[in-house]
Design a protein with these regions (language model features):
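Alpha-helical assembly-interface signal, strongest on the long, hydrophobic N-terminal helix that forms
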Residues: 2-76
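Short, conserved structural patches
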Residues: 2-3, 52, 56-141
Length: 141
């Protein structure tokens, strides 16, 4: 009787070890995958907020291209968004600056951000290829 109980107990321990060996990597992948997705959402939202806020600055009558560029880059730096490119365009006059813009002209702020510089996974799996782009449009006041 005792011999049977010992065998059953050690078989259960072996089963638990095998289950943990299978489930633990899945749980780790799930946790790190969730962290990666949340970080990418945060970076994208930060870039969108920077584009929107820069567009708000651009709509003011007293602002110029340098003010808008500086404001967008400051917001991106504060949110730790790396290697972002900000472009400012007067869509109505088809110019890449907002100097000499008139009331009612459409302004576009575009922010391009590479994934590789802004995610944790590039330390593990190498440089993440690709980038994303966000845009904000407003009319000059």
């Amino acid at each position: 009787m005792r011999h049977t109980q010992r065998r059953t107990r050690s078989a259960r321990r072996g089963t638990a070890t095998v289950e943990m060996a299978i489930v633990l990597p899945v749980l780790i992948a799930l946790v790190f995958g969730s962290i990666e997705i949340c970080q990418r959402l945060h970076v994208k939202q930060s870039a969108l907020i920077a584009a929107y806020e820069a567009c708000r600055v651009a709509t003011r009558p007293i602002s110029d291209t340098a003010d808008v560029q500086t404001h967008a880059e400051t917001l991106l730096t504060q949110q730790d968004v790396k290697q972002a490119t900000v472009s400012i365009r007067n869509m109505t006059q088809a110019k890449n600056n907002i100097n000499n813009i008139v009331t009612g002209d459409e302004i576009r702020i575009r922010v391009d951000v590479p994934w590789g510089a802004n995610t944790v996974s590039h330390y593990v799996i190498g440089d993440s290829a690709g980038s994303f782009r966000v845009e904000a449009f407003m009319l000059r006041e």
